[in-house]
Structures are given as C-alpha cells and as structure tokens.
Amino acid sequence: MELLTGHGLWPVAMFTVILILLVDLLHRRQRWASRYPPGPVPLPLLGNLLQVDLKNMQYSVHKLQQHYGDVFSLQMAWKHMVMINGLKAVREVLVNYGEYTADRPKIPIYEHGSLGPKARGVILAPYGPEWREQRRFSVSTLRNLGLGKKSLEQWVTDEAGHLCDAFKDQAGRPFNPSTLLNKAVCNVITSLIFARRFEYEDANLIRMLRLLEEALTNISGFIPEILNTFPVLLHIPGLFDKVFSGQKTFAAIVDNLLTENRRTWDPEQPPRGLTDAFLAEMEKAKGNPESSFNDQNLRMVVNDLFIAGTVSTSTTLSWALLFMIQYPDVQRRVQQEIDDILGPGRSPEMADQARMPYTNAVIHEVQRFADIAPLNLPCITSRDIEVQGFLIPKGTTLITNLSSVLKDETVWEKPLHFHPEHFLDAQGCFVKQEAFMPFSAGRRACLGEPLARMELFLFFTCLLQRFSFSVPAGQPRPSDHVVLGVLKSPAPYQLCAVPR
C-alpha cells in the first residue's frame, strides 16, 4: 500500500513516464525508418563510399536515381545525406522549404584552409545574419556599380571588343578559345572588384588564371572527398599545404590586389568597385564586433566572386562555341537574326535581347545542355521536412541534382539533345521554362545570375556578329566529351574564327 501513497508513488510515476517516452521513441524511430528515403545498404564504418564513384558523382547519382527514385539516401562513412532529383522534388526542397534548407553543412577542407575565423564570405557561409548582410551588400553594390544600367553594360561591351580583337589576331588559324574566354570574363570580374582590367598578355593575369584553375582542380575529385569524410587526416603535418597549394598562392595574389586597391582608395570619392564599397562599410562598422565587414571577410568575399564569377561564365561560353561548330545550321540561324536586328556595324545591347528570341533560346539551350554544375552545393536541413512523402530529419545534408532537372525527361521534349526549340513557342517567341535552373533556385540561388546573363548575351552575340566558326580543315568534328572537375568543361578543342 505504501507504493500508492506519499513518497512511494514518485518512483512509479517516474518509471511510467520513462517507459512511455521509450515506447514513443521506439515508435518514432520505426516511423522515420519506414518513411526515410531508401538507398543502398551502407557498409560498417565506410557507409556507401565504395558504392559510388567519387571522381564522377553525377554518374553514380544518375544510376542510383534510376534504381531508388527521385529522393534517396546515402551514407558517406558516418555522414547521412539525401539526394534530391527531378524538377518537382528539387523545387520542393529549394523553394517550398527554402527557409529550412538554406544553411550549409560544415565542409572540413574549407574550414581547415580558411582565411581566418571571421572569413565567411557568401557562397559557403552559414545561413544567418552575417550571410544576409553580405548577400545584401553584394547585390546592392552590383546594382550601384551599374548592374542593369548602362555603366556595367559598357564595361562588358568594351571587354567583348577586346575579346573580338584577340580572336581576329588568330588570323583564321586553329586555336583553343578557352584561354581568351577566361581572360575576358576575368577582366569583367576585376573591373567590378578593383575597377581595373589587364591586357591579355599581362603576366599577372596569366598567372592568376593558372592558379585559379589549379585551385579549382585541388578542391575537386577523390582526395578532397576523402578528406571531407575523414577530416582527422587534415591534421597530418604538411598534407593540406601539399594538396591545396594552388589555393594559398591564388589567395596571395588577391591579397596583393587588395593592398594596391586600399593604397589608392579615397573614401571621399564614390566607390570605384566592390572593394572600395566594402572598405567604406568597414569604416562604418568600426567598434562593432558583430559586423561581418572585416579584413578577413573582405578577402573571402573577393575570393568567392573570382571563383564563382570567372570560370562558370567562361566555361559556358566555351561550350557555346563548341556547339556552334558542331551545329553549323544553328550558327547560321543565329547570325541571320543578328544581321536582321543589328546589322554588320552596331554592337549588341541588352535591350536587343527581347528582339532576338532565337539567339536567346540558343544561349539558354547551351546552359541547359552543357549542364556545367550538375550537383548543387550541399545544404543542411534546419528542421524536419517532408519531401515527396519521405521524412527527412533536421540536420540532414541535402544535395540537389540540378542535372536531373535540366535533363528531366518529363519536362523537356529532347532532354539528351541540343535543341534550342526547347525555349521557343509555336510562333517563335522566347519562352523560359520552369525547369531551367542552372543558377539553382531559392534563397541560395546564384547572386551573380544577372551579371552572367549579361556577359553570355553580349559576348556570344558580339562573337557571332564578327566571326564564323568552323572545325579546322583536316580535323575531325570535336566530340562533346567532358572534363570533370568542380565544373563540367568541354574536352580541349580547336576552332577557326573567320571574320565575316
């Protein structure tokens, strides 16, 4: 009877509560297990590491999607992740659940090689006040410097003229256009950041692009994936500096440019470029330890803009010229539209884009078919979410497969073929498709998308206005084989640029 009264009742109540909680937890685990996305059975310790090709994750993801469906799970050692495929599921994750999928997981190789504890940047920064402050600053600064206005457009138009002059210097001889395209796009970025451009033969520009390519090569492939999976290896003395040597050297070049910019900065004058604007914000934020405007973050933001803004656009342009020599009928039709709208002498302007539906469709199809960034940067859930009927717990790493959207067979008429008509209606008017998302979507969509669109249209149209491109005599038609890295690049090829 003592158990039912006084102190004796307390242990019984505690035992009952604990039992109820344990039973509830068991049921919750069973529910999650039954509704958690399916996937290959993980091995002890290794998870699914031996069941995927870390050098070609896109292919592995495609094969697993065919077997498990649009939403499936992987376990990389002890790290759980869910792959999201197809337009419907990707939009659900990035747009419908945008507030809860905007954060980034920790990426050990970036944290170990950080430019400092306050160097968050924009691309890989955690979702929070600092990220919002820097994204807002970047967007507003680009707008103030002329994005969507004539000033920035004139910079790009002038650079397109320099690029065409460099193509003309090839005198119709075979050459690989990628190097010149890299230089032109890099000059647009340096104009935005430092309000300066380099001559194409400038040793500093050549070295900067070489180191940028090396840095991007360093962070892609098998070794970085292993180091991210087993970060304890990063503490092996000298390993990081050996594997990622290009990153540190590239950062040193950027530091030199920042030092020169700071030396010539006049705070009384309007900002010449993004660095001036950032320095002005640093002055305003003095004494505020919570501000994200500091020297370390300036370095990181500039590195982010170089990496995100240079190689992606130049790689897309390289694919565009490859497709023009592979599909000469498309090239001729683009040139006919250019001649009809611009004539032989007037340089293209962004205002012309609305009157050039076929050219616009071709540029969009280049981006869709080239598919240069098949797997999006990882994000992490900040709460439990339900996607396509599957329950995904808080703290799960998600990777959205943008390639599965750009090649979604339920959306595109000819997903595996180069077909500009994907973006034209029956009357020949341009139509943007919902499944066109090479810049991602949602809160983490690429902030440089408007600039990239401007560069693609002005560079591509200017080149097709002034040159006809062809396969060099005696050479086979180039293949569309890819070189895998951070981005999908075309295998090296040559073309002839004959002045029109």
UniProtKB/Swiss-Prot annotation:
Pfam families: p450. Keywords: Endoplasmic reticulum, Heme, Iron, Membrane, Metal-binding, Microsome, Monooxygenase, Oxidoreductase. GO terms for molecular function: heme binding; iron ion binding; oxidoreductase activity, acting on paired donors, with incorporation or reduction of molecular oxygen, reduced flavin or flavoprotein as one donor, and incorporation of one atom of oxygen. Signal peptide: none annotated. It is a peripheral membrane protein. Its EC number is 1.14.14.-. It is an enzyme of class 1 (oxidoreductase). CDD domains: CYP2D. Its cofactor is heme. GO terms for biological process: arachidonate metabolic process; xenobiotic metabolic process. Its main location: endoplasmic reticulum. Heme binds at residue 446. GO terms for cellular component: endoplasmic reticulum membrane. It is found in: Endoplasmic reticulum membrane; Microsome membrane. Belongs to the cytochrome P450 family. This is Cytochrome P450 2D28. The gene is CYP2D28A.
